[in-house]
Amino acid sequence: MAGQKIRIRLKSYDHSVIDSSARKIVDTVTRAGATVVGPVPLPTEKNVICVIRSPHKYKDSREHFEMRTHKRLIDIVDPTPKAVDSLMRLDLPADVNIEIKL
């Protein structure tokens, strides 16, 4: 797989889970003999939802809820077949969204 690059994007609502998953990916791929760039922290998306506290009136009384999406980027430069195979077998938590591009 000479000259190729694998780009992995991780998304999660919990920053500790995404950091441990990124660390696990980097350790697995470096043990398989490929070079890794990252994990690079990407900007955190902050989604704020505003709702009225009362069911009928009192529009001045509102409550804000926010949902933060943490993202990380990992590049695998010149991946070996052993590294790709170990990536496929890797077990990661369910609350981490993974996008892999070649």
UniProtKB/Swiss-Prot annotation:
It comes from the Bacteria. InterPro entries: Ribosomal_uS10, Ribosomal_uS10_CS, Ribosomal_uS10_dom, Ribosomal_uS10_dom_sf. One of its GO terms (molecular function) is structural constituent of ribosome. SMART domains: Ribosomal_S10 (SM01403). SUPFAM superfamilies: Ribosomal protein S10. One of its GO terms (biological process) is translation. Signal peptide: none annotated. The keyword Ribosomal protein applies. Keywords: Ribonucleoprotein, Ribosomal protein. Gene3D superfamilies: Ribosomal protein S10 domain (3.30.70.600). GO terms for cellular component: ribonucleoprotein complex; ribosome. Involved in the binding of tRNA to the ribosomes. Belongs to the universal ribosomal protein uS10 family. Part of the 30S ribosomal subunit. NCBIfam families: PRK00596.1, rpsJ_bact. This is Small ribosomal subunit protein uS10. It comes from Clavibacter michiganensis subsp. michiganensis (strain NCPPB 382).
